[in-house]
Structures are given as C-alpha cells and as structure tokens.
Amino acid sequence: YLPEFLSGDGWWGQGFSESEAGSDLAALRCRARRQGDDYVISGHKIWTSHAETANRIFLLARTGTPESRHRGLSMILIDVDMPGVTVRPVKLASGRAELAECFFDDVRVPAGRLIGAEGEGWAVAMYLLQYERAAWAWLRAAVLLQRLRALTGLLSDSTAPAPAPGAAVDEVLGSVYLDLLALRARSVDTVRRLAAGQTVGPEASADKLLLGACEQSVYDAARSLLGPRFLFGDASRQWREEWWYSRTTTIYGGSAEVQRGIIADRVLKLPKE
C-alpha cells in the first residue's frame, strides 16, 4: 500500500467509534465472522474520519465474543467500494463534512486484509491513537499559534471596531499564548520519541488534554474579544466555523474524561473507585 500513499492516491478512513461505543471503544459491536478465506463484516460505524473521500477504511471489528471486550477485537482493511458498504456524510455544526456514518451489510473481505493477528486489534488501534493524540497536538499547536497571530492582528487594526467592552485584551491573549507554549513544550518530547520509533504511553493523553484546552481557549478568546464582529458578517465566518469545530476537541480521539482516567490510572496510580 505504500506506493499509493507516496503518490497521493491512497486515502484511508478510521472506522473505530459506534453509536454505543465511543469513549468506551471496547464495547463496540461491529462483527467480523470468519467464513473460509474471508471475513464477513456486519454492523456500522459513526464519526468515521474522511470516509466519504477515502478509498479504504481500517475497521476495528469484533471477532471474539461480546464479553471479550478489547481482547476480542481485530483490525481489518476494507475498500469503500466493496459490495455492502454504504457511506453517509455527517454534516457538523461547524459546516464541515469530514466525518461520516458507515454501514456494513455482510461485506465479504479477504482474510489477508487482517492487520496484525486476530484478536489483537486493540493493540493496533492504541498504536495508531498515540499518533493521533500526540503528533496531531504538535501540528495543531502550530496552526493555533498562527490563528492567535491573526486574531492579534485583527484586534490591532486601527480601522477595526474596538474590542468588546470590558475585555482585557493583553491578559486574554497572553494567557492563551502561554497555554500554547506549554502545549508545544509538552508535545515536542512525544514527537521526538515517536520519530525515534519509541512507544508513547500516557504522555499522549497529556498532549491530548492540553490540545483540547488550547483549541477551545483560542476560539473562546476570539468570540470574547471580537464581540459583535464575531457573530455577524462574512469576515468572521471562518472564526465562527472554527469556534464550533473547537467544541469537539475534548471529545474526538478519546474524550478528556477518558484521558484523565488514563493519567489517573497509569501515572498517578489512583484507586479505581
């Protein structure tokens, strides 16, 4: 599959979450039954990233018993044009449509599409998520710094309306900037470890928590400081759309509550109850 990635022809979606299995991913129900040289997939996924434009989806499905939880999951690669696959885009409040709902109606997939060993899909998923939670944090930090500079320039424009009444501009912008510096300082170590081929543990959860807080603080600052300009007019449309999207950052890729639970368990060694 590497040539299609290098040429830009390959685009894969991530089929993890379900309606009843989001933060508790190990509760997923999408089923993969072995029949001869194939797996037969039945079930559905939601919030599948880029499924509408993807040519393949790496799917986390249950090959074990329902009570097997994470020990009974397998990762299987599916082509979106296989018979029985239906993709429906999900339009978000932000206006974006990068997520989709996917239905699998007895989709027959060659057993050679299994990634890793049967029953070990959880380990594959966690390996992938460390990149989503960590490398993504480093990338987004750069984007958010650029957006903060754009906001600062907008507020500094002498021809623009004054900031919202009572807004302590320097204090708000300074606080957001310090949060972004903390995110970069935390995530750079994670990115270096990933680049060196090392496995990242709960550090990725810390990166994910910081990213969610920073993402929302940047756009909350825009909403607060721009005042009425934020709510009306085409000039602020991008800010409004990005503010809506920032609401999801403490949910997607593992909610903030889940990340705190990982840190509490694996770093702080707190009791389960």
Locate predicted features.
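A short core secondary-structure module
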Residues: 38, 42-88
